[in-house]
Amino acid sequence: MNNVYESPLSSRYASKEMLYNFSSDMKFSTWRRLWVSLAKAEMALGLPITQEQVDEMEAHITDIDYDVARQREKEVRHDVMAHVYTFGKVAPKAAGIIHLGATSAYVGDNTDIIQIREGLLLVRKKLATVLDKLAQFADAHKAQPTLGFTHFQPAQLTTVGKRATLWMNELLMDLGEVEYRIENLRMLGSKGTTGTQASFMELFDGDESKVKELEKRIADDFGFAGVVPVSGQTYSRKIDAQTLATLAGIAESASKFATDLRLLQHLKEVEEPFEKNQIGSSAMPYKRNPMRSERICALARYVITDSLNPAFTSATQWFERTLDDSANKRISVPEAFLAVDAILGIMINVVSGLVVYPKVIEAHVMNELPFMATENIMMDAVKRGGNRQELHERIREHSMAAGKRIKEEGLENDMVDRIAGDPMFGMTREQLLEHLDPSAYIGRCPSQVDEFLSECVRPAIAPYLTGEEIKVEINL
């Protein structure tokens, strides 16, 4: 429909997999799976529930009549009870035991945790793919000297590949955070209205071992290591805050990468992919805008800002729970996942097609290298009998003059010619040029790249690169 607002995150940016994870089908079929799990555990622990009732429920996990649910919710003003009713319509023999002993948070919060886990698993896969692509890029360009920048002013040389490891190092931190969140995520379990499990103690005649076993069976059904040890009615909203802080961390790293790439594209040293028929500007046909990187930055700002929502929600929950969390988390949590999913998809696309222009890079290097080489030139001249302090002053004078020529007259750097013509140095132009090999100024860059990839990156991403390669289609 074109007359109803549609979020760009769903219509333009996020993947089908992530969209499904936060879809109504995923949500409400998971509610039904949770009701089945509860009924099976209660039956196994001695409550009067039959296999026939469980079988009937299991046969109707996905055939959700949303019209019936919507109509019922209008009548009772309660989404969970509307879906209990709707489930009971297709599983009439089980209608009387659906949701037995549970409160709304049993299906709502446990489903939220499941969606968070599945979302993090999707993020982890894409994050590992980004790191894999960047590792290939870093390895290919580990020995390509390039200007390093501090304050966005030319500094000492680095290499194109070494710079890529800086992006990767931050993403590797993010991968560790994602892994930690997945590993430590726990279900709410079956805690009852205020977290005391009083309703289940009543059902099981005060048998605490059965109440605890009930939760264990439910957690096992959904592949969790356990349930939260204590809670109010809901799981702590700090879990949402921590999850979105992790997603915001990915957004931070992605924005840093994309910002650097935008600056490199301005310098014409490295460019993001640009398709054959892509139009950069409606008015300036020659333009090649870094729109993918700009989109990464735009979405990253959204995620970083969005991460404040669950933080405020967690900080303002009262006692065992208040409902002012609900409307906010319905928006903030899924949309953070959708945005990060989009960011990582764009990054995979960009990193897979980065274009490096070595000749431009070399020209920029050679324009600055004469200044960088002056310390080595000075030491060589001292070895030939020169006075270090006098040579230092003469280099300062030549540097100022060469810099003025470049900045005010737009001419090339003539620092080498100035020193070659200065008898104080006693060096020919050829001798000076020996000091202008860029590879002599990159330190351990190639080795650092090799070590980082072999010792840190590849072991970390190897478990997640099995199976079909992720293919990303970007909607421009």
Functional labels for PLM-detected ranges:
Residues 1-198, 204-217, 280-281, 291-295, ...:
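A helix-coil-helix interface module used to build multimeric assemblies
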Residues 19-23, 68-70, 278-298, 320-335, ...:
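Short beta-alpha connecting loops at secondary-structure transitions
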Residues 25, 117-128, 135, 161, ...:
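Short amphipathic alpha-helical segments with heptad-repeat character
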Residues 139-161, 271-287, 320-327, 352-372:
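Glycine-rich cofactor-pocket loops
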Residues 208-233:
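Active-site-adjacent "gating/activation" loops or surface patches in catalytic cores
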Residues 234-269, 278-339:
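A conserved active-site cap/scaffold subdomain adjacent to cofactor or substrate pockets
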Residues 271, 394-401:
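Active/binding-pocket-proximal capping segment
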Residues 302-388, 394-397:
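Long, amphipathic alpha-helical stalk/connector segments used for oligomerization, subunit docking
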